[in-house]
Amino acid sequence: MGNYTIAEIVQILIGLFLGIGLLQSGTDKIVDWKGNMSFLTEHFAQTFMRSLVTPMLMVVTVLETVGGILCLGGVAMALLYQNFDLILMGMIVIAFNFVALFAGQRFSKDYAGAAVLVNYFILTIIGILTYYF
């Protein structure tokens, strides 16, 4: 382990935070697919997206799981080799995931749920921006 800049420490911490949260969420969707399908089918029942629940759940599950793995793998790479590329890739995948989740929450008129996602999205964008400033 070498010396890290403040930006690199922030990248590691945000990558760790997002990696844990998103990998857990993606894993939960895989383990409890039936429960998640039931919840989302009801959640989107009164929207034009009701027939898209299965593909939406599949996309979100892949984005969360891949984003989480990239971030956690990236943290390991950063600590072992001072290579931060995987964290950035994970954050980009996770940012797209949050946009998809936000759209779903808004279309289902779950405004409180959409509002909660804003904090995670901002954190993710801050993490991405640390690579460029």
Regions found by a protein language model. Give the residues of each.
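Extended, low-polarity transmembrane helix blocks
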Residues: 1-28, 58, 62-133
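Cytosolic, membrane-interface loops and tails of multi-pass inner-membrane proteins
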Residues: 33-53
